């Protein structure tokens, strides 16, 4: 479950003394419904925006948009998120994690938590528990 990944990320960060964790978010069928190019109507899944807002407000969490959308659509999405008070730090990259003696991030960039329907995230089931966990974890 996604909560296990979140708890593992927080635990690892605390143990290692890391100041940040890196969270990837696919867009279609994860944050918003897919319309497969038919029309412009896309809907946010319940609790997605509320959860993203909590995460966006945290200095210890880096949000990365992980999408195969075309650049012009990404600009539209980023503007929409910005207007909602949700700020993704990066798009399809994590320049903060650099190569080291034990890891090469030239092709696969570093992240701690992945929200993607292709990776088992179920937006209709998983957003609310994540939201509730963060409310409890952060005391909001």
Where are the regions a protein language model picked out?
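HAD-like aspartate-dependent phosphatase fold
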Residues: 1-140
């Amino acid at each position: 479950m996604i909560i296990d990944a979140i708890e593992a990320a927080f635990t690892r960060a605390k143990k290692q003394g890391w100041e940040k964790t890196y969270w990837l978010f696919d867009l279609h069928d994860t944050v918003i419904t897919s319309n497969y190019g038919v029309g412009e109507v896309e809907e946010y899944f319940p609790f997605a925006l509320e959860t993203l807002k909590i995460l966006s407000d945290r200095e210890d969490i880096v949000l990365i948009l992980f999408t195969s959308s075309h650049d012009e659509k990404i600009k539209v999405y980023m503007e929409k998120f910005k207007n909602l008070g949700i700020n993704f730090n990066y798009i399809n990259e994590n320049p903060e994690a650099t190569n080291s003696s034990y890891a090469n991030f030239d092709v696969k960039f570093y992240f701690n938590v992945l929200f993607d329907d292709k990776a088992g995230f179920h937006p209709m089931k998983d957003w609310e528990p994540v939201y509730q966990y963060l409310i409890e974890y952060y005391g909001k």
